[in-house]
């Protein structure tokens, strides 16, 4: 249900703003998006996993807050991020 260390490192490298960047909103949103995609696949086969679904909803809310923060601080970075992640909006 979680992403592997290699997948997480790949996402961090792709979305990092500088070397060693792990905490920027772009990286955090990208990691959350990867975890959300993994959990979405999990729920296709495990429909009754309501405890896991709660965790998914918390991740979606966290991602939404980070996206709102990014949009408030820098609209261009926000537009670039949602385009690179393929998020609708």
Swiss-Prot record:
<protein>
    <recommendedName>
        <fullName>Small ribosomal subunit protein uS15</fullName>
    </recommendedName>
</protein>
<dbReference type="GO" id="GO:0019843">
    <property type="term" value="F:rRNA binding"/>
</dbReference>
<keyword id="KW-0687">Ribonucleoprotein</keyword>
<comment type="function">
    <text>One of the primary rRNA binding proteins, it binds directly to 16S rRNA where it helps nucleate assembly of the platform of the 30S subunit by binding and bridging several RNA helices of the 16S rRNA.</text>
</comment>
<dbReference type="GO" id="GO:0006412">
    <property type="term" value="P:translation"/>
</dbReference>
<keyword id="KW-0694">RNA-binding</keyword>
<comment type="function">
    <text>Forms an intersubunit bridge (bridge B4) with the 23S rRNA of the 50S subunit in the ribosome.</text>
</comment>
<comment type="similarity">
    <text>Belongs to the universal ribosomal protein uS15 family.</text>
</comment>
<dbReference type="GO" id="GO:0003735">
    <property type="term" value="F:structural constituent of ribosome"/>
</dbReference>
<dbReference type="GO" id="GO:0022627">
    <property type="term" value="C:cytosolic small ribosomal subunit"/>
</dbReference>
<keyword id="KW-0689">Ribosomal protein</keyword>
<dbReference type="InterPro" id="IPR009068">
    <property type="entry name" value="uS15_NS1_RNA-bd_sf"/>
</dbReference>
<dbReference type="InterPro" id="IPR005290">
    <property type="entry name" value="Ribosomal_uS15_bac-type"/>
</dbReference>
<dbReference type="InterPro" id="IPR000589">
    <property type="entry name" value="Ribosomal_uS15"/>
</dbReference>
<dbReference type="Pfam" id="PF00312">
    <property type="entry name" value="Ribosomal_S15"/>
</dbReference>
<comment type="subunit">
    <text>Part of the 30S ribosomal subunit. Forms a bridge to the 50S subunit in the 70S ribosome, contacting the 23S rRNA.</text>
</comment>
<keyword id="KW-0699">rRNA-binding</keyword>
């Amino acid at each position: 249900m979680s992403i592997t260390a290699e997948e997480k490192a790949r996402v961090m490298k792709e979305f990092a703003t500088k070397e060693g960047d792990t905490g920027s909103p772009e990286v955090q949103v990208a990691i959350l998006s990867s975890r959300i995609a993994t959990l979405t696949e999990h729920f296709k086969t495990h429909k009754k996993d309501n405890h896991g679904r709660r965790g998914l909803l918390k991740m979606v809310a966290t991602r939404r807050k980070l996206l709102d923060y990014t949009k408030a601080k820098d609209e261009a970075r926000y537009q670039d991020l949602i385009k690179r992640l393929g998020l609708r909006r």
